[in-house]
Swiss-Prot record:
GO cellular component terms attached to this protein's record: lamellipodium; melanosome; nucleus; phagocytic vesicle; ruffle
Main location: nucleus
Protein name: Macrophage-capping protein
A single MF term (Gene Ontology): actin filament binding
Species assigned in the record: Mus musculus
Length: 352
């Protein structure tokens, strides 16, 4: 059990201190808890908070941003993250996760992979898919990508969405088909099967029929839903590499000091390239470690830095990404002093 924290006026329950995984969807600027059986299901139109409390009070707080989520929703998610982080005594390492570019740590919470819905919000298809009474009316198609980090993304219900190099899941409610392209490999096929079984168990209470389909042996029910099967395009192997890649640790990183002495957040470069001297990290300040060319930005928060600087860490990261014209998919990791990751430490030549 984590150290009790005052809950006065908090939108989060006292259980946020419990070990394990906690997930909230941002809904009308409030956090709405996600039931355990729905963990791993994300809507592209929404933003989420994912908190993992591990042993020895080692917490990680992830902000998951859907590709179609609004700026208002993303802003509300950031505000709630600041509140939750403060509630937990600023212990968590914070991460910004963008749909389709999640970190390996985030993916490790969901061993059966992630499933993305195109729709989002309270009135979305989420309620339809969890309702057994409407199970027969469900018609959804998912493309399964990645050999290590599995992501299932909802696609238009058409043969045009298929290719011969990937696996797809056609969810018809009472029947779930895992279709495997002729050029997909055995690992991908096994992952597609596992994901189809996970849909059956979590969304149909184990009562749907799962069938593995080989390219060219489509049953009549698939043809009835999708129409006559045309010649299919080939897959793109680069997409699997992107889904599975672990971003390299570039040596050409830079280090910036964050200051609000003028009333605004300003950045001053203190080192042009790594490895850096660890003495550059002063406990009274916050710093940006720029590894943006490898799609990664780190914010280090000194334990004596003022509250405004610490709480603005995510805002500083977003502004830095825009200023440097980095990809919006750039991952952000916010590290309190004393919670530095091994990857972060590799940028320093004399870490103690």
């Amino acid at each position: 059990m984590y150290t009790p924290i005052p809950q006065s006026g908090s939108p989060f329950p006292a259980s946020v201190q419990d070990p394990g995984l906690h997930i909230w969807r941002v809904e009308k600027l409030k956090p709405v808890p996600i039931a355990r059986e729905s963990h791993g299901i994300f809507f592209s139109g929404d933003s989420y908070l994912v908190l993992h409390n591990g042993p020895e009070e080692a917490s990680h707080l992830h902000l998951w941003i859907g590709q179609q989520s609004s700026r208002d929703e993303q802003g509300a998610c950031a505000v709630l993250a600041v509140h939750l982080n403060t509630l937990l005594g600023e212990r968590p390492v914070q991460h910004r996760e963008v749909q389709g570019n999640e970190s390996d740590l985030f993916m490790s919470y969901f061993p059966r992979g992630l499933k993305y819905y195109r729709e989002g919000g309270v009135e979305s298809a989420f309620h339809k898919t969890t309702s057994g009474a409407r199970g027969a009316a469900i018609r959804k198609l998912y493309q399964v990508k990645g050999k290590k980090n599995i992501r299932a993304t909802e696609r238009p219900l058409s043969w045009d969405s298929f290719n011969t190099g990937d696996c797809f899941i056609l969810d018809l409610g009472q029947n779930i088909f895992a279709w495997c392209g002729g050029k997909s490999n055995i690992l991908e096929r096994n992952k597609a099967r596992d994901l189809a079984l996970a849909i059956r168990d979590s969304e149909r209470q184990g009562k749907a029929q799962v069938e593995i389909i080989t390219d060219g042996e489509e049953p009549a029910e698939m043809i009835q839903v999708l129409g006559p099967k045309p010649a299919l395009k080939e897959g793109n192997p680069e997409e699997d590499i992107t889904a599975d890649q672990t971003r390299p640790n570039a040596q050409a990183a830079a280090l910036y000091k964050v200051s609000d002495a003028t009333g605004q957040m300003n950045l001053t470069k203190v080192a042009d390239s790594s490895p850096f001297a660890s003495e550059l990290l002063i406990p009274d300040d916050c710093f940006v470690l720029d590894n943006g060319l490898c799609a990664q930005i780190y914010i280090w928060k000194g334990r004596k830095a003022n509250e405004k600087e610490r709480q603005a860490a995510l805002q500083v990261a977003d502004g830095f990404i825009s200023r440097m014209r980095y990809s919006p998919n750039t991952q952000v990791e916010i590290l309190p002093q004393g919670r530095e990751s091994p990857i972060f430490k590799q940028f320093f030549k004399n870490w103690k």
